[in-house]
Amino acid sequence: MEKITSKKTVFLIDGSSFLYRAYYSLRPLHTKQGEPVQAVYSFIRMIKKMIDAFKPSYLTLVWDSKGKTIRHEVYPEYKATRQEPPSDLFKQKEHIQEFADLIGITQIAQSGEEADDLMYSIAKDLEKNGMNAVFVTSDKDMGQALSDSITIFDPFKDQFIDAEVFEKNMGFSVKKLPFYFALLGDASDNIPGVKGIGKKGATDIVQQFDSLEDLYENLDKVKKERTRKALEEQKKEAFLSRQLFLLHYCPLNIDLKDLTFDRNQWMNALPLFEALEFKSLVKDIQGKLPLEKRQKLSELKGYTFKTIITEADLAELCQQIQQEKIVAIDTELNGLDPLQDKLVGLCICVKKGTAYYIPFGHEMAEKQLSRDQVLNAFKPLLIDPTIKKIMHHAKFDMLALIHYGIEVKGLIFDTLIAAHLITEDWQRIGLKSLSEYYLNEPMFTFADVVTNNGYKKFGDLPIDLATEYAASDAHQTLQLEPILRAELIKQNMYTLFETIEFPLIQVLFEMEKQGIYLDTDILQKIDKQVTYDLSEIKNHITELIGPEFKNINLNSPKQLGQLLFEQLKLPPQKKTMGRTSYSTDVEVLEALSELHPVPALIVKYRELFKLKSTYIDALPTYINPETGRIHTTFSQTAVATGRLASSNPNLQNIPTDSAHYKGLHLRSAFKPKEGNVFLSADYSQIELRVLAFLSQDEALVNAFLKGEDIHTRTAAKLFDTSIDNVISAQRQIGKRINFSILYGLTPYGLSKDLKIPFKDAKIYIEKYFAQYPQVSTWMDSIIAETKEHGYVTTYFGRRRYIPGIYEENKVLFDLARRIAINTKAQGTAAELMKLGMINLNKALKKENLNAKILLQIHDELLISVPQNELSQTEKVVKQILENVVNWNVPLVVSTRFGNDWQEITK
């Protein structure tokens, strides 16, 4: 659009709408002092993106006024149903307004007026003077103002909307939008509309009649009696709703020169960015300096970072480590795969003030030792358990070294794992972030020295720059260790660290080193079948819709929307102003499947296509060419509840057969090594057993002590029948409620999930708590505990801070409540599994068994076992895992064995 880039365009930002969207667009973000700033950061980022993209000469920030507006005079209940804003929102607004003042953005607000009306009024005044206006907003109300000189830019969809785009999306002209909302209403603003008329009904009426007046003059032409009756009975509400929705003009007498904006003032916000700790925004301003002009950590603090390039210096360093018996170690690789990428150097620190980098894989180095020289010298030190090692993300470095035949012994601390325990969810735990947070010592990032300098990999770096970066890694790790150790003790989490999280590093290291075998021949057979099935589904769809659509992309929501809603004339389920495509998510397709066979086929096609693209095609690319196995990564720091997460690839998410691909058996491609079988050890209903123990609900505890089927027992009470008379469908409902109660089950969610009336779902939940009353009491106690401390703790002491627990906003409080309850139960269950893995790993070695834990899938372990050790291993597994704690609620482990993963899948 030519007018958008013209100097005759004024950008008007809906500040109030932006503020709320910015608040919810990011996870909570805080300064070191705990001040929430995510709305400020997100708001500024959105402004920056817009300024960079459009380089506006005129820019204005428009705000709603405080208190009542003229619409409240017309309708006192206007916006009455809105939740209280988050408690920290308005403090963040003050920072945003300060930012706008610093960079010279004019801010406009007027008592009794809303931002929408002010923007409309400014735009109309500009229009008279031949100027164009762009409303920067996602507010649907503003569509009514669209004209040749007024356009909307939705920053969240990165999309311009003019009158033509609007009419294409909505199916009627801009001038009819107030008519449309007179019928539909707006729940967010408590504008009533005409009850009983939804989006489709409103659209049909607006397309049939010219205006609200025309509609009421010709009510007899409304075909549906129910709709006609609703219109007759709610005429007053319809006209009121239109009045509330209409934008109104208010004189402002603003001079155009007051709206000018100079992009060069951006640097004025630097002190604010520094105060709020917006490091990326600070670096954006300061980072324009060449790296050589930026102060190095070694210069800033007077540290000495040395490069080791002679055998004499290497021998002297090894001697120092041998004498001190403690060392911080880091590795430098040419990539992120420790079992494949080339090791190019070691980073060493023995005492604060001096650190070393030993390069041996830098391609442009004039002089460096060989890899063999360095590793041969260091191997005796690295495998010596009496020499204490401190690392940051130890598992990665241990894998990098085992790739060269060195198994590290003597690890005593991992700063990454410690930091994850003691920090809040919003805090970053990378070494650079920890150095700046705890030591106030900024370090160069990988991007600073490699990516931004035009290098492709670490081994390309010149030695002096590599030394500054790498030696600082080991140096700061050594400095952080006593600080983080003390913080663990202070927060009562040292026992958790020492008994669970730290020893788990070795277990996960061994699992990742071992890897798992993938039979690509089986995968190719599955691929052949899936490819055939996809082709057949597409052919079937073509038969149903006609050959002219045979080239349609079934993975394109836009093309599918056109097919379903324009060609097949199926009713749109989700479509809002400003979207360029129809919603075709699985919920929509399942609803449409009752009206036409094509949507059901599309659901099946999508599931098969995802199976092929995400698993069948992708998994072989992860096979290590040296080992012939897949080595996934297990993270202890990715999930706030403490659960382990698998990535590269995610092997916790390998699907079992579904209704859409029965018989494909993707898991059958995963096999144990020759002579072994797979043993699955699965904790039965572990989270429910945790719930029973933590709540000490008598009925729940007794059910597990008696070995009853807990789902059948729950269902019997729900349906007022005996346990013997519970049918399968009833048990499924009992199961659904049992497992969902810890995830904040609501009547609405249950009714939607089970496709039952809301009132029935509400009764089921009430009966559940009547059956297990102590569960409700326990949940209340968790909320009280969280409110008292600001955090919830698991049974073993892991903390999770939940600031939303103090919210007056019901939506935010309910979310915080669910998080607190779920963290207590899921986090405790995760710790039981971790403790079980640690104890089992020790027991297998103690019994001289050759079984290896390969995977952890949340409540289940996949173990490779020699066939001649199967019976003994199974006994050890059950004995260890079932007795990991001494509770009055038994832990039960079910075991299965088979020749591939599919055979042991339930």
Give the residues covered by each predicted segment.
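Noncatalytic, basic helical substrate-engagement surface that gates or grips nucleic-acid strands
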Residues: E2-V136, K140-D162, E237-N253, D258-T260, ...
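Conserved RNase H-like, two-metal-ion catalytic cores of nucleic-acid enzymes
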Residues: I4, V10-F11, G15, R21-T60, ...
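Non-catalytic nucleic-acid-binding/docking modules located in mid-to-C-terminal regions
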Residues: I4-K7, P56-T60, Q97, I105-T106, ...
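Short alpha-helix plus adjacent loop in nuclease-associated cores
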Residues: E77-K91, H95, A145-F172, R228-A230, ...
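Conserved "right-hand" nucleotidyltransferase catalytic core of DNA-directed polymerases
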Residues: A230, Q234-M364, W426, L434, ...
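Acidic, glycine-rich two-metal-ion catalytic cores of nucleic acid-processing enzymes
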Residues: L333, D341-L343, I348-K351, P380, ...
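Catalytic palm active-site di-aspartate
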Residues: D414, D473, L504-K513, D519, ...
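A common structural junction motif
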Residues: Q771-P773, Q879-W887
